[in-house]
């Protein structure tokens, strides 16, 4: 039992030599993100006799609680659109296929969902219960541990979300400007300390490193795809620098949200991704066609919730699109942004009448009809 706990907490074999016979066969022991999946599976294994299927079901269950938390959060903002939002959060194929097995992505969907829910409860509803604060800390830690780059898209979008939500309640122009500048200052200082605190981890996801890695990955996967008839994609030549990478911003976003195209699919699983991408293309065209491009973006910029979805989706889509270069990997990496982008489309398409106004949301003490699964 003692050795099991030491393995669970990734004790160094220098401090605990008894773990060495076990970790010598685990090459992922020194990768905290990968090992966290195995550690969580080991805990679930206590409840299931270390049988894979029950462990996978537990992963799927907890992932669903996060997705459900996201769904209920947005339903309380747009109660008339509960059916349309259900499609966005609960029925996107990639989300429940890649977010319901023993994967890093499954844990991240759990954490991201509860991070959205608790952030909304704490900062908008002002519900500072111990449960919400603990869930917020846990979800933030899990995302940081397993896929910290999600935070690089989430934190800016969250800051804008909170800024626009709170500033909309201030009627005096001067006070609104002062509060906005104060918020930006505090957010900037907080982001600075965040980057300093996690400088080593964030360095792997700096723009310079991403640019260099993207160029290397592009060349390698292009070679492999040519030799093995693989599912790689190419965004074209670009200089491995920040400026060169930014020039591929539109292509990277498009490949994440709207590709592969049907003629690019060489495998059944890629064809399914292509069909899903066609659905995204269709609803995107319909949403902007119905209201017009100018009115659609005006609606996005005026609604803090839509603006959050837009910023997070676009930043995240760019990050994974510029660095994956393989449709198979991309279909898994992109799932955190899909519900937010599609929910934005649903609101643009079907929000006709007034929903809950922001003051009602802020004063709301409890999200109705939501039953926590944990």
Q: Predicted regions span which residues?
A:
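Membrane-interface helix-loop-helix junctions at transmembrane boundaries of multi-pass membrane enzymes
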Residues: 76, 125-131, 285-311
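Short acidic/glycine- and proline-prone juxtamembrane loop motifs at membrane-interface regions
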Residues: 101-106
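Membrane-interfacial entry segments at the cytosolic side of transmembrane helices
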Residues: 128-133, 167-184
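Transmembrane-helix signature of polytopic, membrane-embedded enzymes
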Residues: 53, 70-91
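Transmembrane-helix motifs of polytopic, lipid-linked glycan transferases
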Residues: 41-43, 55-77, 282
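Juxtamembrane segments of multi-pass membrane glycosylation machinery
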Residues: 15-58, 258-265
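Membrane-interface alpha helices of multi-pass inner-membrane proteins
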Residues: 96-97, 131-154
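Hydrophobic, aromatic-rich transmembrane alpha-helices
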Residues: 66-69, 252, 256-261, 272-299
